[in-house]
């Protein structure tokens, strides 16, 4: 294979990965907890963008319940975003397993 052709393909892949990362930074996923009374929205690059808590699940005498519910729902949103990002990157790389930090 021609080295120049290979270099051009690598540059095209890098451009595609950069575009995908930019897209994923603005693409959001939402998870719910407590039967929809808690909603967490995050970008696919792991930033929380919205947190909605129905006042009916706030019990000042049981803050542990709300804390645990928040952690579970936030972690679920982050995991969902990572799964979405990984699937998108896999499309671009043709299923190549890239080293950490080279994909998304």
UniProtKB/Swiss-Prot annotation:
Major localization class: cytoplasm
Molecular function via GO: DNA binding
UniProt xrefs under Pfam families: YbaB_DNA_bd
Task of the protein: Binds to DNA and alters its conformation. May be involved in regulation of gene expression, nucleoid organization and DNA protection.
Protein's name in the database: Nucleoid-associated protein Amuc_1227
Keywords annotated in UniProt: Cytoplasm, DNA-binding
Subcellular location: Cytoplasm, Nucleoid
Coiled coil location: none
Cytoplasm recorded as keyword: yes
Assembly information from the UniProt record: Homodimer.
A cellular-component GO term for this protein: cytosol
Organism of provenance: Akkermansia muciniphila (strain ATCC BAA-835 / DSM 22959 / JCM 33894 / BCRC 81048 / CCUG 64013 / CIP 107961 / Muc)
Protein origin, superkingdom: Bacteria
Family of the protein in this entry: Belongs to the YbaB/EbfC family.
